[in-house]
Amino acid sequence: MVFAPGEKPGNEPEEVKLQNASKQIVQNAILQAVQQVSQESQRREERISDNRDHIQLGVGELTKKHEKK
């Protein structure tokens, strides 16, 4: 292997360590972002489901009022 001026053969393992650490940081950031999006999607679905339940209750009440007339 040919080294540039001022570069020492012992630097390569340190560079590999830094590259591996960088890869791990990126992987962790991606994983965290995916988990966050997943949680937000789940919360959104729960809110939509809750809203549907409220709408159905409202329709049921309207139907009962209409039947009484």
From Swiss-Prot:
One of the protein's GO biological processes: protein localization
Biased composition (Basic and acidic residues): 41-55
Disulphide bonds in the chain: none
Pfam families recorded: AKAP7_RIRII_bdg (PF10470)
InterPro entries on file: AKAP7_RI-RII-bd_dom
Tissue expression as described in the entry: Preferentially expressed in the neural tissues.
Superkingdom field: Eukaryota
Region (PKA-RII subunit binding domain): 17-33
GO CC list: cytosol
One Gene Ontology MF term: protein kinase A binding
Positions of the UniProt region annotated as Disordered: 37-69
Quaternary organization: Binds cAMP-dependent protein kinase (PKA). Interacts specifically with RII-regulatory subunits of PKA (PRKAR2A and PRKAR2B).
Role of this protein: Protein kinase A (PKA)-binding protein. Binds to type II regulatory subunits of protein kinase A (PKA) and may block the A-kinase anchoring protein (AKAP)-mediated subcellular localization of PKA.
Written domain comment of the UniProt record: The RII-alpha binding site, predicted to form an amphipathic helix, could participate in protein-protein interactions with a complementary surface on the R-subunit dimer.
Protein name, as recorded: A-kinase anchor protein inhibitor 1
Origin species: Homo sapiens (Human)
Lineage: Eukaryota, Metazoa, Chordata, Craniata, Vertebrata
